[in-house]
Curated annotation (Swiss-Prot):
Pathway(s) where this gene product acts: Cofactor biosynthesis; FAD biosynthesis; FAD from FMN: step 1/1
Source domain of life: Eukaryota
UniProt-recorded Gene Ontology molecular function terms: ATP binding; FMN adenylyltransferase activity
GO biological process: FAD biosynthetic process
Keywords, comma-separated and alphabetical: ATP-binding, Cytoplasm, FAD, Flavoprotein, FMN, Nucleotide-binding, Nucleotidyltransferase, Transferase
Name of the protein in question: Flavin adenine dinucleotide synthase
Species for this entry: Saccharomyces cerevisiae (strain ATCC 204508 / S288c) (Baker's yeast)
Keyword Cytoplasm included in the entry's annotation: yes
Family membership noted in the UniProt record: Belongs to the PAPS reductase family. FAD1 subfamily.
Amino acid sequence: MQLSKAAEMCYEITNSYLHIDQKSQIIASTQEAIRLTRKYLLSEIFVRWSPLNGEISFSYNGGKDCQVLLLLYLSCLWEYFFIKAQNSQFDFEFQSFPMQRLPTVFIDQEETFPTLENFVLETSERYCLSLYESQRQSGASVNMADAFRDFIKIYPETEAIVIGIRHTDPFGEALKPIQRTDSNWPDFMRLQPLLHWDLTNIWSFLLYSNEPICGLYGKGFTSIGGINNSLPNPHLRKDSNNPALHFEWEIIHAFGKDAEGERSSAINTSPISVVDKERFSKYHDNYYPGWYLVDDTLERAGRIKN
């Protein structure tokens, strides 16, 4: 898929979600969250830094938050290009999308689940990402500031980086949508237009998109770090716990299903790697999929504290 086609597809997904008439509280709040993210991107970010010439890069790790933001970013990228093309003296049919791949950085801090690594590579091709992957330091965690510093040295034209962090994430509470990095970091602008989203918004839009989702979420993970500090969320353990699924409508009416005459409850998750299958076979419990969890305060309950 070409980047122009990927961006146009993401625009169609986003536009379709914004026109859902089934106004559950979750969908209505997610529509408002999308509108605010679009405002940040189109009215505040793209007017200061061009998304078409390498001034902006995208931080991507294959997680649910990053993927949601990537879909919205590509959607706005298409709209930005379309508006500029419409305002040109030349007809739209003679306009060509000026980018082949989206500049992207993957900060690979820890030993990662092979399923997630595979998903990052697969979606890099799907969304036409020019992926720079930071190097781990002899098996140890790499310092994030140093990893970004290495990236900036290789891509000095980068002035701003889009980051899919939310207010409920560690150290996210006081962040702003647009802010400069701290003094001990390489100098660039942090673009964080997803801060106001909550967990229900993330699941609702991602499940509706019908895009491939990292298979680890289907195994009960809700927050994915390294293999040594991430487990399925204990609040999704299949014992006496019987959580409700809040996203049945989004799953059944997901983008593209109606057009194909489908009304299935299947969810597009990526394959689990052989290595991870063996690892998960040693778990003594079974878990509901990650999207059964909607409490932001419990999202990181599967992360092991060092």
